[in-house]
Amino acid sequence: MFWLLALLAYLLGSLSFAIVLSRLSGSPDPRSCGSGNAGATNMLRLAGRKMAILTLLGDLCKGLLPVMLARLAGLDLQEQAWVGVCAVLGHLFPVYFRFQGGKGVATAAGMLMGLYFPAALLAIAAWLLTFYLTRTSSLAALIATPLTLPLLAWREPAALLPISVLTVMIVWRHRNNLRDLFAGRERHF
């Protein structure tokens, strides 16, 4: 059952709401415009608030839904977390869109909502505060993502390894943003 749910999570994660919504709305493909990222932040730049909110909600749901299905199927917490990681992998490397996806932040937040809601609230609050102070989405993601690790280590240690892998994946996807942050070239809102 685990492998079936992991595969389904990857396939669901591969549905890129940014790409689909950009096509439906006649907006530019987010992979080739703006930051080049197929995610909610770039959709805000390219297609406006409504498309960005729809992208965000879709990306959150594709992280949450597989974890909830894994829970309903009776998988333990660590297996649920790995299923969620598969959804994020699908977002990062979507099979339907030549493996060119987003950075996984919203999908990871949805996954955390299903695993341990207080960790998701912590990450979202940290993201919002950092974004408010810096107006830099990538910096907000790079600060918010690892903040969940101590809380999970304390409250849900079974999820620590998958969430650690997830954190590394998200930081790796932000490697160009890190270079731009250190060089003072990162985009701000």
Curated annotation (Swiss-Prot):
It catalyses: an acyl phosphate + sn-glycerol 3-phosphate = a 1-acyl-sn-glycero-3-phosphate + phosphate. This is Glycerol-3-phosphate acyltransferase. It is a multi-pass membrane protein. Keywords: Cell inner membrane, Cell membrane, Lipid biosynthesis, Lipid metabolism, Membrane, Phospholipid biosynthesis, Phospholipid metabolism, Transferase, Transmembrane, Transmembrane helix. InterPro entries: G3P_acylTferase_PlsY (IPR003811). Its main location: membrane. Catalyzes the transfer of an acyl group from acyl-phosphate (acyl-PO(4)) to glycerol-3-phosphate (G3P) to form lysophosphatidic acid (LPA). This enzyme utilizes acyl-phosphate as fatty acyl donor, but not acyl-CoA or acyl-ACP. Belongs to the PlsY family. GO terms for biological process: phospholipid biosynthetic process. Pfam families: G3P_acyltransf (PF02660). GO terms for cellular component: plasma membrane. It is found in: Cell inner membrane. It comes from the Bacteria. Its EC number is 2.3.1.275. It is an enzyme of class 2 (transferase). The keyword DNA damage does not apply. Probably interacts with PlsX. Pathway: Lipid metabolism; phospholipid metabolism. The gene is plsY. The chain crosses the membrane at residues 1-21, 77-97, 111-131, 151-171. GO terms for molecular function: acyl-phosphate glycerol-3-phosphate acyltransferase activity.
